[in-house]
C-alpha cells in the first residue's frame, strides 16, 4: 500500500506506482513563469508517489539526463540555429520515439501541441491516458513572436490543436476565460478543469513598503517582453506620471531581439532613458527580493486575442499580490479572476496610458491606499492561490483518470 500523500487518498492504489510522462516544450529550470508552473506540478506529482519522467528541450547548458524534485528528467538536444518550428517538430519526434521504447506509461501529460499532437494520436497504440494542459495555443500566440508567419501554417496548427484537444482524455487550463475559449472550439465545458497558477508562501510573503522619503519611487514590471504584455502602453504612461510625480520604471524580463529593439527605440523616442531601466531576467528565487524593492508593481496586459479570447493566468500578478505590493493591472477578465478592483489592486482601462498614469498617481500620492490594497492582495493570494491548492486540483484530475483504467 502506498503512503498517504498530497494528491491521492490513502488506500487508493494496490501496490502499483503509476508511471507518468510529463512533457513540455519549455526549458526547465528557467526564469519563465512556465518553468515555475512545471516545477510545482512536478513536485506535487512526485509527492504523491508517482514515478514521474519530465521530458523537455535542452538549452546547451543543462545536462541531458537529470533529476528534479525526485523526478527523472530528459532534455532533448536542440540545434539552436534552427528556427522555432524546426525545433518544435524535432522535440515532438523525440518524445514519440521515447514512448515507443520506454516502459509503458499510465498517464501522458503534455503542455503543448509540440509532442502533444503525436502523443494524443498514439494513446490507443501504447495504452496510456492523456492530459492536455492548455496554457497557451500556438495558433493564437505564435503570430506575436513571429509576425511573418503564413496564415496557412497557422490554420494547419489550429487543426492539429483541435485534433489534440478532442483526442485527450482530460484537459486542464489556468483560467475560466481559457475554458470558455476551449468550449467555443466544440469541447464540453464540463470536461475542462480550471487550475489557476499559484504562489509559494515560503518564497512570496508581504514585507513593509519602502520608505518614500528622499528617494524616487520604483514601479516594477517582471515578465516577458512579448507584444501582448502591453509594455508600449506602460512606456507611454511614464511621461504623464513624471509631469506630476517622480518615478523610475524597472522592466525585468526576457525578450527576443526584435522586442528589445522596439522597446529601446520607444524609450529613446520619448526621452525616457533616465526614467526607464530594462534588465535581463533573473532566476526565479531572486524575484521576491526584486518585488520587495518596488513601490508599485504593474501588469499592463494589452487588449488582444491572447489575453481576451484565449485567456491566461498571469503568475506575475499573483506574485506581486503575495509579496504585499500595490498592484496596477489591466481591467480584463483574466485579471478579475484574481484581483478585486479597489480591494486588492487598481485596475485601469486596457491600452489606455492616461488611465494607467491616473491610477499610478493615486498610489504614489496616497500611501494609506497603497497599504490597504497591498494588505488585502497578500491575504487573498496566500489564502486562495497557492501551488499547494493547484497541486490538489491536479491530483483530482489524475485520480479520476486512474479510477477509470
Which residues does each PLM region occupy?
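Conserved donor-binding/catalytic core segment of Leloir-type glycosyltransferases
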Residues: 21, 212-238, 250
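Glycosyltransferase donor-sugar binding loop
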Residues: 60, 248-264
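Membrane-proximal helix-turn-helix segments that form the acceptor-binding/catalytic region
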Residues: 96-102, 117, 121-125, 132, ...
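Carbohydrate-associated surface elements
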Residues: 177, 198
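Nucleotide-activated donor-binding/catalytic signature segment of Leloir-type glycosyltransferases, i.e.
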Residues: 261-289, 296
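Short hydrophobic beta-strand element within catalytic cores of glycosyltransferases
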Residues: 297-299, 319-322, 326-329
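Conserved acidic donor-binding segment of nucleotide-sugar-dependent glycosyltransferases
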Residues: 317, 341-342, 346-353, 362-368
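A short, well-ordered alpha-helix in the C-terminal region of glycosyltransferases
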Residues: 355, 362, 369-384, 393-396
Amino acid at each position: 500500500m502506498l503512503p498517504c500523500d498530497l494528491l491521492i487518498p490513502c488506500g487508493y492504489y494496490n501496490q502499483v506506482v503509476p508511471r507518468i510522462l510529463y512533457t513540455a516544450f519549455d526549458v526547465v529550470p528557467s526564469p519563465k513563469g512556465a518553468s515555475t508552473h512545471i516545477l510545482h506540478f512536478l513536485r506535487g506529482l512526485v509527492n504523491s508517489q508517482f514515478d514521474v519522467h519530465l521530458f523537455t528541450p535542452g538549452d546547451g547548458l543543462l545536462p541531458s539526463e537529470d533529476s528534479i524534485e525526485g523526478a527523472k528528467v530528459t532534455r532533448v538536444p536542440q540545434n539552436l540555429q534552427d528556427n522555432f518550428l524546426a525545433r518544435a517538430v524535432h522535440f515532438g519526434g523525440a518524445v514519440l520515439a521515447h514512448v515507443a521504447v520506454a516502459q509503458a506509461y499510465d498517464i501522458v501529460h503534455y503542455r503543448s501541441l509540440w509532442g502533444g499532437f503525436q502523443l494524443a494520436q498514439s494513446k490507443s497504440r501504447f495504452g496510456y491516458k492523456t492530459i492536455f494542459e492548455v496554457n497557451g495555443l500556438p495558433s493564437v500566440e505564435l503570430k506575436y513572436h513571429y509576425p511573418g508567419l503564413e496564415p496557412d501554417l497557422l490554420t494547419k496548427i489550429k487543426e492539429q490543436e483541435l485534433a489534440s484537444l478532442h483526442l485527450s482524455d482530460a484537459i486542464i487550463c489556468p483560467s475560466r476565460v481559457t475554458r470558455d475559449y476551449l468550449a467555443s472550439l466544440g469541447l464540453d465545458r464540463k470536461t475542462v478543469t480550471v487550475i489557476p497558477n499559484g504562489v509559494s508562501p515560503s518564497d512570496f510573503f508581504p514585507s513593509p513598503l519602502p520608505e518614500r522619503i528622499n528617494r524616487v519611487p520604483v514601479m516594477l514590471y517582471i515578465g516577458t517582453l512579448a507584444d501582448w504584455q502591453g509594455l508600449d502602453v506602460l512606456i507611454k504612461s511614464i511621461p504623464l506620471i513624471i509631469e506630476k510625480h517622480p518615478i523610475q520604471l524597472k522592466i525585468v524580463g526576457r525578450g527576443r531581439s526584435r522586442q528589445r529593439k522596439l522597446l529601446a527605440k520607444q524609450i529613446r523616442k520619448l526621452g525616457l532613458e533616465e526614467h526607464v531601466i530594462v534588465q535581463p531576467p533573473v532566476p526565479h528565487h531572486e524575484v521576491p527580493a526584486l518585488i520587495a524593492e518596488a513601490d508599485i508593481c504593474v501588469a499592463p496586459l494589452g487588449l488582444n486575442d491572447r489575453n481576451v479570447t484565449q485567456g491566461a493566468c498571469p503568475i506575475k500578478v499573483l506574485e506581486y499580490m503575495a509579496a504585499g505590493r500595490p498592484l496596477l493591472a489591466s481591467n480584463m477578465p483574466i485579471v478579475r479572476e484574481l484581483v478585486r478592483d479597489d480591494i486588492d489592486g487598481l485596475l485601469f482601462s486596457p491600452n489606455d496610458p492616461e488611465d494607467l498614469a491616473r491610477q499610478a498617481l493615486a498610489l504614489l500620492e496616497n500611501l494609506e491606499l497603497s497599504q490597504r490594497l497591498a494588505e488585502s492582495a497578500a491575504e487573498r493570494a496566500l489564502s486562495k492561490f497557492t501551488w499547494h491548492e493547484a497541486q490538489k486540483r491536479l491530483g483530482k484530475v489524475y485520480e479520476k483518470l486512474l479510477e477509470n483504467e
